[in-house]
């Protein structure tokens, strides 16, 4: 997990970690975690912080060491990336920016990707993703489709 981080990112995280490790003992408290993450441009909710701590704080002592912190940050960044990638992909399909992907928009993008689909195939793709049955795909439906694999 942490091998996906660049040396620069690791150095950045180490610096931030050290700033909040007041007594220099190599651990930060759960309370300090939110402050550290916000200083790195993340914006976790209280529930997310608690979940992250529970995931990495193996002995349940309320403190996190640097390797645990790195694992957690790598995980958090991965989630953010994939969410952003899905949003970007949706924008590519949603040509007119109305928040929906129509059959025509889907056909246009698939054709540009070199996929020659029949109208039936395009309609079938829309039907599979179209949870509320309105004949087009909204962002929530698109996310569900992209993350269901």
Swiss-Prot record:
Function: Calmodulin mediates the control of a large number of enzymes, ion channels and other proteins by Ca(2+). Among the enzymes to be stimulated by the calmodulin-Ca(2+) complex are a number of protein kinases and phosphatases.
Native source organism of the sequence: Halichondria okadai (Marine sponge)
Positions of post-translational N6,N6,N6-trimethyllysine modification: 116
Residue numbers binding Ca(2+) 1: 21, 23, 25, 27, 32
All copies of domain EF-hand, residue ranges: 8-43, 44-79, 81-116, 117-149
Superkingdom of this protein's organism: Eukaryota
Modified residues (N-acetylthreonine): 2
Binding site residues for Ca(2+) 4: 130, 132, 134, 136, 141
Name this polypeptide is given: Calmodulin
GO CC annotations on file: myosin II complex
InterPro entries the record matches: CALM/Myosin/TropC-like (IPR050230), EF-hand-dom_pair (IPR011992), EF_Hand_1_Ca_BS (IPR018247), EF_hand_dom (IPR002048)
Alphabetical keyword list: Acetylation, Calcium, Metal-binding, Methylation, Repeat
Family annotation (PANTHER family): CALMODULIN LIKE 3, MYOSIN LIGHT CHAIN 1, 3
Chain sites annotated for binding Ca(2+) 3: 94, 96, 98, 105
GO MF term (any one): calcium ion binding
Parts of the chain that traverse the membrane: none
Residues binding Ca(2+) 2: 57, 59, 61, 63, 68
Family to which this protein belongs: Belongs to the calmodulin family.
UniProt KW Metal-binding keyword: yes
Further comment found in the protein's record: This protein has four functional calcium-binding sites.
């Amino acid at each position: 997990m942490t091998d996906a981080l660049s040396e620069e990112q690791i150095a950045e995280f180490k610096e931030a970690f050290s700033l909040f490790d007041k007594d220099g003992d190599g651990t930060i408290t759960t309370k300090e975690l939110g402050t550290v993450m916000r200083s790195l441009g993340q914006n976790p909710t209280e529930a997310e912080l608690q979940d992250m701590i529970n995931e990495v704080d193996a002995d349940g002592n309320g403190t996190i060491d640097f390797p645990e912190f790195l694992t957690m940050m790598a995980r958090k960044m991965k989630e953010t990336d994939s969410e952003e990638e899905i949003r970007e992909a949706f924008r590519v399909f949603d040509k007119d920016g109305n928040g929906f992907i129509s059959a025509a928009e889907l056909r246009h993008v698939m054709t540009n990707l070199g996929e020659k689909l029949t109208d039936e195939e395009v309609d079938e793709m829309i039907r599979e993703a179209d949870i509320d049955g309105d004949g087009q795909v909204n962002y929530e439906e698109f996310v569900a489709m992209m993350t269901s694999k």
